[in-house]
A protein has these predicted regions:
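Short acidic/glycine-rich loops and adjacent helix/strand connectors
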Residues: 1-249, 253, 257-266
Length: 266
């Protein structure tokens, strides 16, 4: 059969499958820009003409508001929607010629879940026929929509409020950490309580952004993944320091070379 997979919303590429052969498209880009959406439609048409194919079905992300989903639905073909994190696991299975049922761990930014919440830290039991959601990271309230992906301090305030359950404790902690003003914190807590522009999320990426802000590493990101990456680098640096400390005999002050198991001076 012939199938077209519409690709993701960010860093989009699509793919046309003909029986057991697959033809990925050139890089298209982020579909938040309408010019890129237009380029996606044009590139789909050109690749279909080049390959002389007429796809019978189109596959797209489960998110109803993704432009990739909208484009897929406009093709006039039967649409098969696949959950974002299930797709990640399927790609790993296909790459490794895995035909068995697996326990898949999929941690990333955000993806639309089958329950209408935002997923991103998932453990799924999966095969090519479907999946069962076995578990996830603890859900939290993500306030501010897409803005919170760039401003991790918003996630931080939400995490603090969720874990204290008390407005005054939240305001006190936020003030000590210098995350935002008292008024901003009050607004975010109110939004979380009333579910105003707030969604339940299990996104590992957003959790890392929030923790990065709480630890004073990055309050916000100026480019994609900045806060999470900075958190990773800080953790690696701390780990390196801990390993270095353990390699020094605190009594004699002599350093032990682990690889050769010999003592060195200095």
């Amino acid at each position: 059969g012939q199938v077209i997979a519409a690709g993701g919303e960010l860093k989009n590429t699509f793919c046309i499958g003909v029986d057991n052969r697959f033809y990925p498209s050139p890089y298209v880009g982020d579909l938040e820009d309408l010019r890129t959406v237009k380029a996606l439609k044009e590139t789909i048409g050109r690749l279909e003409t080049l390959l002389e194919v007429q796809p019978e079905v189109v596959v797209c992300d489960l998110h109803p508001k993704y432009n990739s989903t909208v484009v897929a639905q406009e093709l006039g073909l039967p649409v098969l929607k696949v959950q974002h994190h299930y797709a990640h696991i399927l790609s790993c299975m296909a790459e490794n010629d895995c035909e068995e049922k697996v326990i898949g761990v999929s941690f990333d930014g955000t993806g639309y879940g089958t329950d209408g919440t935002i997923w991103g830290g998932e453990i799924l039991i999966a095969d090519y026929q479907g999946f069962t959601r076995l578990g996830s990271i603890q859900p939290f309230v993500q306030v501010g929509g897409d803005v919170s992906a760039k401003e991790g301090w918003r996630i931080a305030v939400s995490l603090i409020w969720q874990n204290t359950g008390d407005l005054e404790k939240t305001l006190d902690t936020v003030q000590k950490l210098g995350l935002c003003t008292e008024q901003e914190a009050k607004v975010l807590v109110t939004m979380a309580q009333r579910k105003l522009n707030a969604v339940t999320s299990t996104s590992a990426g957003r959790l890392f952004d929030g923790v990065s802000a709480i630890l004073g590493i990055r309050r916000a990101s100026t480019f994609e993944g900045e806060a999470s990456t900075a958190l990773e680098f800080a953790a690696e640096a701390w780990r390196a320091q801990e390993i270095q400390k353990k390699n020094v005999d605190t009594v004699s002050g002599e350093r032990t070379d682990i690889k050769r198991n010999v003592e060195t001076t200095g």
